[in-house]
A protein has these predicted regions:
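Generic preference for hydrophobic/aromatic residues in regular secondary structure cores
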Residues: 1-4, 89, 165-175, 195-199, ...
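N-terminal onset of structured domains
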Residues: 39-135
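Eukaryote-biased detector of low-complexity, proline/serine/threonine-rich segments
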Residues: 63-66, 188-236
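Low-complexity, serine/threonine/proline-enriched polar segments
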Residues: 101-198
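Exposed low-complexity, polar/acidic, P/S/T/G-rich flexible segments that act as propeptides
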Residues: 223-262
Length: 262
């Protein structure tokens, strides 16, 4: 899956939604949050028509045994400013993680989407920025909803730093939580590569439904007790003290989702 992001090279939002290329973070923002539904898959093609078994990137069954997510990441900075990167992976059936909140002021292509596909490249490795943007963020309601559910307590009362906050495991099924420090130790920036394997090894039952002779396909999990739920990947970046708008971080990825069908 190719990297797509809703950020510009400045770290600001793209005016017309996600585009192909790295995700960018500005040092002026205390925290920048990206989120992605890694298991979002329909049984229909982006351009219309049903998926077939010869299309390896498409699912053709409502129940899939998810093996895991493989990802090769490249992170680079343009200055010696240090960064903290926290990755959290979790499973959930809560619709607040996959739907845009009506309270957002964003509209059209700038509205929150938990995954992105198009007719050329199919499903993408999306980095959708929910926070930051130098005060121009228009997905505040969705951002608050997601983080209120994910973390224990309230920001500013029970915690301040999202890279230190405890995940609320009563509300989500935590699968992975790791903090990585990015620092050059000299006057140059850093360029580092990471390989991540996130195992799942559970069934995912998609919320498909019949409509006469037509099967209405959903990209998301059912809300009942069947299956593991949607597998979400959240990346949080925080700059070190003294960072400014001139300090930038870029992240790109090549990702693959593996599953078996029943």
């Amino acid at each position: 899956m190719l990297t797509w992001s809703n950020t510009q090279t400045t770290g600001e939002l793209q005016p017309n939604g996600p585009v192909a290329g790295p995700a960018y973070v500005s040092g002026q923002n205390p925290f920048t949050v990206f989120i992605w539904d890694a298991t979002a898959r329909r049984m229909t093609q982006a351009g219309g028509g049903s998926a077939t078994i010869v299309q390896e990137a498409m699912r053709t069954s409502p129940t899939c045994y998810m093996r895991g997510l493989s990802e090769h990441l490249r992170i680079q900075t343009n200055s010696p400013a240090p960064w903290i990167w926290r990755r959290i992976c979790f499973k959930t059936k809560d619709d607040r993680f996959i739907a845009s909140d009506p309270g957002d002021t964003a509209s059209g292509p700038q509205r929150y989407v938990s995954f992105y596909e198009n007719t050329v490249v199919g499903y993408t490795r999306q980095f959708y920025q929910l926070s930051g943007n130098g005060g121009t963020n228009r997905t505040t309601a969705t951002y608050n909803n997601i983080l209120d559910v994910l973390f224990k307590g309230a920001q500013g009362i029970d915690f301040v730093d999202f890279t230190l906050a405890h995940v609320d495991t009563r509300r989500v099924d935590l699968a992975y939580d790791k903090v990585t420090k990015l620092a050059s130790g000299n006057d140059s920036g850093v360029l580092r590569e990471f390989k991540r394997w996130h195992p799942m090894n559970k069934n995912l039952v998609y919320d498909d439904d019949e409509q006469g002779e037509i099967e209405v396909s959903s990209a998301y999990s059912v809300n009942d007790k069947r299956g593991m739920g949607n597998y979400m990947v959240m990346d949080i970046f925080a700059p070190g003290l003294g960072a400014t708008d001139n300090d930038k971080l870029a992240i790109s990825s090549n990702a693959s989702l593996y599953w078996h069908e029943k």
